[in-house]
């Protein structure tokens, strides 16, 4: 270990020459060498924030520096102190019951310690998926089996799967919990055939209590792997073992998925996760800031939450970028600094000017109403209601006066605009379907 420390100290001296002083002081100075195993050098970072920044910005530079010093190509891995117990590859072997099946490995090694129910931020877009996941964790194979969670990238599907695993292990330490991606399942299956170890492969995945399999859409078009997973699914389900599956789309939309697999995925509960609303995005940022011990002004969180609405990973990444930028230029964090820090990833950070025409077009797209109908005298519900929504949004999203809005809707009186605004405002408080439609329109306008 002394040699490793000496090597890292030498590397730090070289790195100090290659980066700016603020960068070195902020990111590199407080790191230490943890271990060197099989051409992988593990470096300890002081906290999760620093680890993430080092991984994304300094891995290549560190590898090059170490190559110059040693002539060896070393892979770099970063850890944080609280995760060393789970990740230290030099720990002595754990004493296991001889009767216990080793094939599935230690479940803890496959679960991210950050992804628990406690760290999951609940919002309108994920509330049902969270409740279903917790129910499954509390009573595996008794609540919903399988549980199928689908949604876009970075919305929390993997977080919930890991949370289920952690909860099960915490309440039943002897439970065999296996988490893996369907890509890994496919690769291991192919290797087992090549190495004539198909029996070992089947024993590994058909003798677990909880199987958590991520990104099942990867199986699309892979007939042999689908066949194997079909039998794995049946074996586990028949033994009342819990299966949790995630995907970027519902089963019926996964192309070239065998019907028999599709039907089994639909046996239990299918739940989706949608992008977080503004309130949830702010809550996510607050939780992230608290976890990292960061003091972030509310105006900055609101700015980031308004600019990043696609997924949680990008949201947290934007926060990290703002904090890093503040540290590097040694300035306090405020909304102006946040805008400067994010200008490369939010090129149009200045608010978009929305016109009444834009609103009419967006509402027309959602409700299939022709542009000319917004100005026509038609009073059928299929036209009148979308027209009222467009008037409401024109009042909310533009600086146009009431008479101007009325003029753009066929010369209607300003009292008609007021009535439309009041009606839609009232409906939005209780009508969830309307809320979703207005949110969809807002998304188009952005």
From Swiss-Prot:
GO biological process: DNA replication initiation; regulation of DNA replication
GO molecular function: ATP binding; ATP hydrolysis activity; DNA replication origin binding; lipid binding
Superkingdom of origin organism: Bacteria
Xref: InterPro entries: AAA+_ATPase (IPR003593), Chromosome_initiator_DnaA (IPR001957), Chromosome_initiator_DnaA-like (IPR020591), Chromosome_initiator_DnaA_CS (IPR018312), DnaA_C (IPR013159), DnaA_dom (IPR013317), DnaA_N_dom (IPR024633), DnaA_N_sf (IPR038454)
Binding site for ATP: 154, 156-158
Major localization listed first in the record, in broad terms: cytoplasm
Keyword Nucleus: no
PANTHER family from the UniProt entry: CHROMOSOMAL REPLICATION INITIATOR PROTEIN DNAA
Domain free text: Domain I is involved in oligomerization and binding regulators, domain II is flexibile and of varying length in different bacteria, domain III forms the AAA+ region, while domain IV binds dsDNA.
Known partners and oligomeric status: Oligomerizes as a right-handed, spiral filament on DNA at oriC.
Protein name: Chromosomal replication initiator protein DnaA
Gene that encodes the chain: dnaA
